[in-house]
Amino acid sequence: MITGRTALYGVVGHPVAHSRSPEMQNAAFAKLGVDAAYVALPVAPERIDEALRGAHALGFQGLNVTVPHKPRAASLCHALDPVATAVGAANTLRRTRDGWEGFNTDAPACRTLLEAAGVARGARALLVGAGGAARAAAWALLQLGTELRVAARREEAAAELCRDLAAAVPGADAATADFEDLEAEADAAAVVVNGTSVELPGHEGRLPPLRFRADQVVLDFVYGDTELARAARAGGARLVTGEQVLVRQGALAFTIWTGLPAPEADMARALEAREGAR
C-alpha cells in the first residue's frame, strides 16, 4: 500500500511504456519489505531538464534513465561515479540534497555478463550503435581487453565514441567499422553487441540480417524475442539477452538506492512473469 511515507522511484524515457523495470524493482522492494514504489515516467527529449528538476522537487529518491536520455542525464548531475564519467552517460540517479548523483550500472553489468560468456582478452568485438547503451558496452568491452570496432549509422558519432572511450580507458584499442558492411564486420568478430534501440517500441529501423556461429558471443540490449537474438540462437552463439542486462544493472541500481543486496532472482522472476502474461 502506498502511504505518505512511501519512497518514490521511477524510470524516465521516451518511450517508456514498454519498460519492465517497474515490475522488477517493485518485486525487489516487496521481497525485502522496503516501503517504496517505482513507476514509469514518459519524458520527451526536450523536457528532460525540467523533468529531472521536477522529480527532485517532488521528492523522488532515485531514478533509472533509459533511451534517449542517458548522456543528457549525466550532464545534469552535480556528481558522477567514475564509470559514468568515463562513459559519458548515466542510467541510475540517486537523490542528494543538492540534486542528482549519477551512476552507470549498464557498463559493469555488461562487463560481468560478457566475462561470464567467455569473452577473451584480445578478441575482436563489434559494437553496433553509439548512444548511451553503446557507450556502456564500449567501456565493458575495453575493460575486458577486446579489440573494439564501432559501427553506427552516423560515422561521426562512432568516431566520437571511440575518441572518448580511448581517452578514458588506458591502452584501449578502439576504431570505427563500416555500418554499410555490417554482415562482414559481424562475421569477422568474436563478440557482437547491439547497443542500438532498433526493435524497441516507437523506434524505426532494423539491422540487416546477421548470421552467427557457435564460437561467437552476442549481446543484445533490447529485450524480447528480437531478430538478433533469434539469429544468435539459430547459429548456436552464446547469447546474452536484454533481460539479463536489465536484471543485472537493475540489481546494481537497487543497491545504490537502498544499500541492500538486491534479490536478483526475484527480480528475474518478475520479468519472466510479465513475459508469460503477454
Swiss-Prot record:
Gene3D superfamilies for this protein: Leucine Dehydrogenase, chain A, domain 1 (3.40.50.10860), NAD(P)-binding Rossmann-like Domain (3.40.50.720)
Record InterPro entries: Aminoacid_DH-like_N_sf (IPR046346), NAD(P)-bd_dom_sf (IPR036291), SDH_C (IPR041121), Shikimate_DH-bd_N (IPR013708), Shikimate_DH_fam (IPR022893)
Keyword Amino-acid biosynthesis: yes
UniProt keyword list: Amino-acid biosynthesis, Aromatic amino acid biosynthesis, NADP, Oxidoreductase
Annotated positions binding NADP(+): 129-133, 221, 242
Example of a GO MF term: shikimate 3-dehydrogenase (NADP+) activity
Keyword Membrane in annotation: no
Broad enzyme group: oxidoreductase
EC number: 1.1.1.25
Residues bound to shikimate: 19-21, 66, 91, 106, 223
Pathway: Metabolic intermediate biosynthesis; chorismate biosynthesis; chorismate from D-erythrose 4-phosphate and phosphoenolpyruvate: step 4/7
Positions of the catalytic residues: 70 (proton acceptor)
GO BP field: amino acid biosynthetic process; aromatic amino acid family biosynthetic process; chorismate biosynthetic process; shikimate metabolic process
Reaction equations catalysed: shikimate + NADP(+) = 3-dehydroshikimate + NADPH + H(+)
Superkingdom of the source species: Bacteria
Family under the similarity heading: Belongs to the shikimate dehydrogenase family.
Task performed by this protein: Involved in the biosynthesis of the chorismate, which leads to the biosynthesis of aromatic amino acids. Catalyzes the reversible NADPH linked reduction of 3-dehydroshikimate (DHSA) to yield shikimate (SA).
Quaternary assembly: Homodimer.
Protein name: Shikimate dehydrogenase (NADP(+))
Taxonomic source organism: Anaeromyxobacter dehalogenans (strain 2CP-C)
